[in-house]
Swiss-Prot record:
The lineage of its organism: Bacteria, Pseudomonadati, Pseudomonadota, Gammaproteobacteria, Pseudomonadales. GO terms for molecular function: 4-hydroxy-tetrahydrodipicolinate synthase activity; 5-dehydro-4-deoxyglucarate dehydratase activity. Belongs to the DapA family. PANTHER family: 5-DEHYDRO-4-DEOXYGLUCARATE DEHYDRATASE 2-RELATED (PTHR12128:SF19), DIHYDRODIPICOLINATE SYNTHASE (PTHR12128). Keywords: Lyase. The keyword DNA-binding does not apply. Pathway: Carbohydrate acid metabolism; D-glucarate degradation; 2,5-dioxopentanoate from D-glucarate: step 2/2. HAMAP family: KDGDH. It is an enzyme of class 4 (lyase). Its EC number is 4.2.1.41. InterPro entries: Aldolase_TIM, DapA-like, Dehydro-deoxyglucarate_dehyd. One of its GO terms (biological process) is D-glucarate catabolic process. This is Probable 5-dehydro-4-deoxyglucarate dehydratase.
């Protein structure tokens, strides 16, 4: 799949990022991951991101990363395109990018580098180096320490033909509007704030109709139904979903830092697809919080 074909796929539909399965000892659980992918693939997501942020990329060893990406690519070979999360320091990100390409990933989600303070010129050089290390399409994730400006993105677009997507995890509306107006159709634009459904209608109005859904991991039917309501501008249905599910969900998610990942794993377990515990430094939901989530999920009906 060439980068422009990937861009076309990412320009419509719902995206998601499967959690990574661990066993009771915290090691990668391949059979559970295959079962998860086989469950989720038929629901109709346009693409899935393996080893992304919700897939705990930041906690994976290099050997595990290779097994996870290969498992995802092989399992979904005939059903849904797999993009691989990559990140870390530049040389590390390049190694991950080239490994994902070798294993057959259709594209990459370039996650922010971890912790290190850097100028945005330096971040742009990092993005350029990763893009030039592979031939497959790359989506850059503006979030946390990665805050690329319209000018820098325009320069990167000129230098890196395979940079085909921009994912926004900042929520800076002025910046998003500036990027969307400046770059036009050069990129596919993805909403990437945690629990992106809450912002989906607003982002669609800005020209960003596509987003990635975390809750697709455990209420896939609801996630797809909500996306279709957004796509057809059914504001009444959207409002009902937000009132009945997403706002109560946020009340649980916002209890602790890191719960944006932990609550998804808890939901997957309740749904019958236990992915095991999160890895430190993340912490799992408490039993009471799991009960609250289970009650909320039960109200949504069969998935």
């Amino acid at each position: 799949m060439n980068p422009q074909e990937l861009k076309s796929i990412l320009s419509s539909g719902l995206l998601s990022f499967p959690v990574t399965d661990f066993n009771a000892q915290g090691d990668f659980h391949r059979a559970g991951y295959i079962k998860r992918l086989e469950w989720l693939a038929p629901y109709g997501a346009s693409a899935l991101f393996a080893a992304g942020g919700t897939g705990e990329f930041f906690s994976l060893a290099a050997s595990e990363y290779s097994e996870i990406i290969k498992t995802a690519v092989d399992t979904c070979a005939t059903s849904v395109p797999i993009l691989a999360g990559v990140g870390g320091a530049t040389r590390q990100a390049i190694e991950y990018a080239q490994e994902a390409e070798r294993l057959g990933a259709k594209g990459l989600l370039l996650l922010p580098h971890y912790l290190t303070e850097a100028s945005q010129d330096g971040v742009a050089a990092h993005v350029e180096a990763v893009c030039k290390s592979v031939k497959i399409g790359v989506v850059v994730y503006n979030r946390n320490v990665c805050r690329l400006t319209p000018t820098l993105l325009e320069q990167l677009a000129e230098r890196c033909p395979n940079l085909i997507g921009y994912k926004d995890g900042l929520g800076d509306i002025e910046l998003m509007v500036s990027i969307r107006r400046r770059l036009g159709d050069r990129f596919s634009y993805l909403g990437g704030l945690p629990t992106a459904e809450v912002y989906a209608a607003a982002y669609k109005a800005l020209g960003v109709p596509v987003y990635s859904s975390a809750v697709f991991n455990f209420v896939p039917k609801l996630a797809m139904d909500f996306y279709h309501a957004i796509a057809r501008d059914d504001h009444e249905a959207v409002g009902k979903y937000i009132d009945d599910f997403f706002l109560p969900y946020l009340e649980i998610r916002n209890r602790k830092a890191g719960y944006a990942v932990s609550i998804v794993k808890a939901g997957a377990k309740i749904a019958g697809y236990d992915a095991g515990p999160v890895r430190a430094p993340l912490t799992d939901l408490t039993p009471d919080e799991c009960d609250m989530l289970a009650a909320l999920m039960d109200k949504q009906g069969k998935q």
